[in-house]
Every structure is written in structure tokens, then in C-alpha cells.
A protein has these predicted regions:
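C-terminal cap/substrate-recognition subdomain and adjoining C-terminal extension
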Residues: 1-133
């Protein structure tokens, strides 16, 4: 499904307050172009160091995205952002178009639109329709 977005000339990215190991894995499987996530750190005995490196604080996604967008030579108004939680609401308000991927209308009202459907195909079909207008 992601290849359909690439055919439209879109770049894809994951921004998560989760861990980079998982974000990288998902990005590779889905052929996502970029990912931003928090890093795990290990000591010389390969033991996990508590805290790691926080690159995407849970409450600062919009700030991290804005920095990333600027570094890529883009504008926030050029971004289509898809989120599924209350922690995405600040980002919804800063980007050009936002999609809340949820069946919760109270969360959905914070985005440009919301989708209550399963699977990436539904999301990709919606974005493809946006570009055919």
C-alpha cells in the first residue's frame, strides 16, 4: 500500500515516541523512507541503560517534526500527518493536512478529517483520493 503513496511522489516517515528498534523494523517492512524514534543505549556489558536517548519526547512530537521538516527543506504546510492518539493532536494543528486514524469522533474532530477503518489500504486510498481532486 505504501508504494501507492510513492507513485504519487510522496515521501513517508514514522515519528514515534516509541523505540527506534521497532520503528526501524516497521519502516523496513513497509518501505517507509524515514523514521524518528527514541534510541536504546547499552553499556559495555550489553546491558540496557535506563532512559536511553530521547529523540521524540511524547509531548513534543510537533516540535521534533518541525525541526525535521525544516532540516529537509520542507514546510509544515506540505505535510500530511496521520496519527491515532491524543498525543498527536498538537501535530494535527501544525501541519497542512491531518488525518486521525481512529473511530473516536472526539479525537477525530482535532484533525482535518478522521478515518474509521482497518488496514493501510483504507488510509492509502483516502490519500490517493485527496491527490485526485
Amino acid at each position: 500500500a505504501i508504494d501507492e503513496l510513492k507513485k504519487l511522489g510522496l515521501k513517508t516517515a514514522i515519528i514515534t515516541s516509541g523505540i527506534s528498534i521497532l520503528a526501524k523494523y516497521v519502516a523496513e517492512i513497509l518501505e517507509i523512507d524515514y523514521y524518528l524514534a527514541n534510541e536504546l543505549l547499552f553499556n559495555e556489558k550489553d546491558q540496557l541503560i535506563p532512559g536511553g536517548v530521547v529523540k521524540v519526547p511524547l509531548l513534543d512530537k510537533e516540535k521534533i517534526l518541525a525541526i525535521w521538516v525544516k532540516n529537509k527543506g520542507l514546510k509544515m504546510s506540505e505535510i500530511i500527518y496521520v496519527g491515532d492518539s491524543v498525543f498527536d493532536v498538537p501535530v494535527f494543528k501544525k501541519v497542512g493536512f491531518s488525518i486521525a486514524w481512529t473511530c473516536n469522533p472526539s479525537l477525530g474532530k482535532n484533525a482535518s478529517t478522521y478515518l474509521c477503518c482497518d488496514g493501510l489500504k483504507c488510509l492509502v486510498d483516502y490519500i490517493r483520493r485527496l491527490f485526485s481532486l
